[in-house]
Amino acid sequence: MAKEQIAVAELVLNMILGKTGGTRVDYFPQKPDFPFDAVYEQAFVRATPESQGISSDLFAALLRELDASKDTEMHHFMALRHGKVICECNFAPYPKGMWHITHSMCKSITGMAIGMLIEEEKLKLDENIYDIFPDHINAFSKIFRPVITVEHLLTMTSGVTFNESGIVSGNDWLGSFLNASVNGKPGTEFQYNSLNTYVLSAIVTKRTGETLTEYLTPRLFGPLGITKYYWETCPKGITKGGWGLFLCAEDMAKLGQLYLQRGKWNGQQLVSEYWIEISTARHLKTQNGTYGYGYQLWMEQRPGSFEYNGMLGQNVIIYPDMDMVLVTNAGNKEMFQDCIMLNIIRKYFPVNYHPADVLPENPLSYSLLKRLCGELENGENNNRSTSLRGRWKRNVVSRRKHSDKKYSYRISAAVDRPSDHHSFMRAVSGRTYVMEQQNIGIAPLFVQVFHNNMTDGISEISFTYDAGNFYVSFTEGEVIHKLPVGFGRAADGCVDLHGEHYLVATLGEFARDENDIPVLKLEITFIEECVKRKVHIFFHEDNGIEIRWNETPGKKMILAGLSSITEELSGNFLYNSLLGDHNITTELLHRLMEQTIEPAVRGYLKSSKETDSIDTDE
């Protein structure tokens, strides 16, 4: 196996075996806290949909369908026409004005930087990347390498085999990319690879002496009034380029509006018209369900339209013929353009749809649209069931044999009074449980892997009821995450992951499962990210708890991303030996990964000396 495959195998193995800690990539805290106090600059003018030629009823129907679909998990939506915001909705618990991870949507911004660099005559499309970085590859190896140009990186046709999975293999991503093997002839086949974009970012740094973020701040972000953003770097200090950017929805809309305006903003030409033209042209066909690829952006279904696209639902859709921009942030379970969310949007803006210049104002329809957005923002229009039944598989775990019937009765009785959750809170308050398996983190695996911020493992969970507020505390490594829990509406909190602070909103519900066992259901939303932690805590009669962990988007996405690796590992003798079995099949490996992604663990009461003093009676 190649070095990067070995590294991925090692990561997967450590997860399966329950090992905590870091990877082969050096970790350093870099994410700043969200700048709440920063003044937002250059906000768009707000207008009614009708004043810009579109019905409020259309947006109301679109938002209802996006919210109701079981295949979508909407976070933010914004629509602009003629440079004015005509619809905006933030789905609970995601607040207005909060930055959001963009994933690959930011590739299009890196493409803009390359266009600027070419306009400044510091770079050419046909330059060989091996000539740009002569010190990163030895002369002998270079003789046998094909020419890979800047344009090949822009169109995802480099053929380089070092891809996203390789970033866990070490700190030198640029060197690994330049020395990796090449599949086929560069420029002939579309092979989506985020490391192509990373190398484009490295080229900006090589030619300017600045990181991509530093280069773009005075040329793009500053002129657009974009002040609330952060872009991660690799261990070598190179901006990731193809992922790792946090950006607000309205600022995403500015980047779309900039292209609608042919690169001009407030009278200043930020991106050349030539680059707008060439980057938004289809340079090659792509897989089924998509419409072609330009320079770091995708073509859309509507003729002349295009899109900045990031996985799980981060999109800026530009419709030049309608002078319109749509922005989405979501946590869908799908990649790229062939997804339910975009198909719903295409349904409301089909090829034959042509909005009017202006429509008569409709105060009633507009009022209903605003009410709907308010309900969605407050979580009052949630069409998704939170029922336990049929959604969580039961796992067999060992149980301790001590019992406290009085405590168990009080917990059970409290759940039987759904109108009085305070009795349940009092029943569990002050109790701390020690985890028998201590390798699970508060952050979803998506967050841990994408930010190279791996868990130290949760060792204890405790409950506190104080002054009418309920808290669940998770002891992870040396840090205690004390999260306020809201019932009916998520409560805001924060977790500290090795010096990086992530804002969360925690929603709770007391219920019983199909076996009549009392359960506390927690949904911990990482509001700057695409993901949620789902934690179900079952209170058993033996005075212990069982905790079932899940995340969304979860198992399906993670297993799909690891499919090629697990298939190869299943037949690898060394890997089988490490797992203690010389006949590990792909099916068994997938089952082990499923249990790793959705574990069930047991906790036992740390001290029961206060049990008899707990009183849940009114």
Show the residue positions of the predicted features.
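A small/polar active-site loop signature that marks catalytic segments
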Residues: 158-233
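Active-site Gly/Thr loop motif
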Residues: 276-328
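Active-site helix/loop module of the DD-peptidase/beta-lactamase fold
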Residues: 120-158, 179, 210-243
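Active-site-proximal binding-pocket segments
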Residues: 216-217, 221-280
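Active-site-proximal alpha-helical segments within enzyme catalytic domains
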Residues: 196-203, 241-264, 314-331
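N-terminal leader/targeting segments and the immediately adjacent pre-domain N-terminus
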Residues: 1-95, 118-123, 363-436, 445, ...
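Substrate-recognition/cap regions that form aromatic- and gly/pro-loop-enriched pockets
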Residues: 432-554, 560-567
